[in-house]
Amino acid sequence: MAFTLEDIVQRFGGEVVGDGSQRVGSLAPLDQAGPDQLAFLANPKYLAQVETTRAGAVLINADDLAKLASRENRNFIVTPNPYAYFARVAQTFIDLAAPKAAPGVHPSATIDPSAQIAASAVIGPHVTVEAGAVIGDNVRLDANVVIGRGTRIGAGSHLYPNVAVYHGCKLAERVIVHAGAVIGSDGFGFAPDFVGEGEARTGSWVKIPQVGGVSIAADVEIGANTTIDRGAMADTIIEECVKIDNLVQIGHNCKVGAYTVIAGCAGIAGSTTIGRHCMIGGAVGIAGHVTLADYVIVTAKSGVSKSLLKPGMYTSAFPAVNHADWNKSAALLRNIDKLRDRIKTLENAAAEKRDGPAPNAASKATGDKV
């Protein structure tokens, strides 16, 4: 299905510059778009591509439009945030193009008689829904999804294949969980019960039952193979509109504030609180029992071992450098204590040459008391 630029502006806002009757039916990058496609400019360093693109129209902001040498025979939708505008248009195109699954329960699904399934829900092959679970309106559960006893899945949510949501969890409206994610598995809680030291040590680790759940608010998206542990006593909490990438681990009792984004391979240890509107980079490790303020940014591969109580950007990772340069730096790090002592000795010698011996040193040399 194609839309005129005027149709798009009426739905999403903005201003058409050029031919409002131009029709576009899909989206593409500036350097690949054709006459029936819509492209966007989000980064001004690609401004030159706007001059050469074959796109039927370009989403652009007013400042970048003013920089163009020519607008002849080109069409634009002017909007303050072309990237977000692109995302909304793309959602519409995808929703219209996607095949619509018919509501109902696949014959191979296993549904406990006490579970409540909305008539508009789509329950795919080999799905399991346990006792007391509630599946809301327009929910889609793809193949092999498992919903534990007493768990509630809010209206409009979509769980992709092989997602497992353990017992006693709550997912609000429009939650998206991608394939292989696990929600509500046991938190990593074990009490040490050992006696003695070394080879004489005896005893074991005692498992602490994890009796909390996981509570996920509306419009959260969770990436593939991500795991969110259930709380030890109270729920692990993910607030509204949080976006979590693939392969992220969130430990028990954590709280992730609204509108925070967490990139792939991040690991967040138990009982950590992350504020609202935070950005956690890929492969970041956050220790347990720490707090991050609202509007904190932690760059990729950083390690957070203590609370960050002020908004801002934090980094602790080493950027990649030439291998030989890294080896030289590593050698210096191994000898940093010796270098510090040598510098201190040289500083003391320079001060003594400039100012004379310190009073303590002079009195000790003559045997006088200070």
From Swiss-Prot:
GO terms for biological process: lipid A biosynthetic process. Transmembrane segments: none annotated. InterPro entries: Hexapep, Hexapep_transf_CS, LpxD, Trimer_LpxA-like_sf, UDP_GlcNAc_AcTrfase_non-rep. It comes from the Bacteria. Pathway: Bacterial outer membrane biogenesis; LPS lipid A biosynthesis. GO terms for molecular function: N-acyltransferase activity. It holds the Pfam family Hexapep. Its EC number is 2.3.1.191. Keywords: Acyltransferase, Lipid A biosynthesis, Lipid biosynthesis, Lipid metabolism, Repeat, Transferase. The keyword Signal does not apply. GO terms for cellular component: membrane. The keyword Lipid biosynthesis applies. The active site is at H252. PANTHER family: UDP-3-O-ACYLGLUCOSAMINE N-ACYLTRANSFERASE, UDP-3-O-ACYLGLUCOSAMINE N-ACYLTRANSFERASE 1, MITOCHONDRIAL-RELATED. Homotrimer. Catalyzes the N-acylation of UDP-3-O-acylglucosamine using 3-hydroxyacyl-ACP as the acyl donor. Is involved in the biosynthesis of lipid A, a phosphorylated glycolipid that anchors the lipopolysaccharide to the outer membrane of the cell. Belongs to the transferase hexapeptide repeat family. LpxD subfamily. This is UDP-3-O-acylglucosamine N-acyltransferase. It comes from Paraburkholderia phytofirmans (strain DSM 17436 / LMG 22146 / PsJN) (Burkholderia phytofirmans). The lineage of its organism: Bacteria, Pseudomonadati, Pseudomonadota, Betaproteobacteria, Burkholderiales. The gene is lpxD.
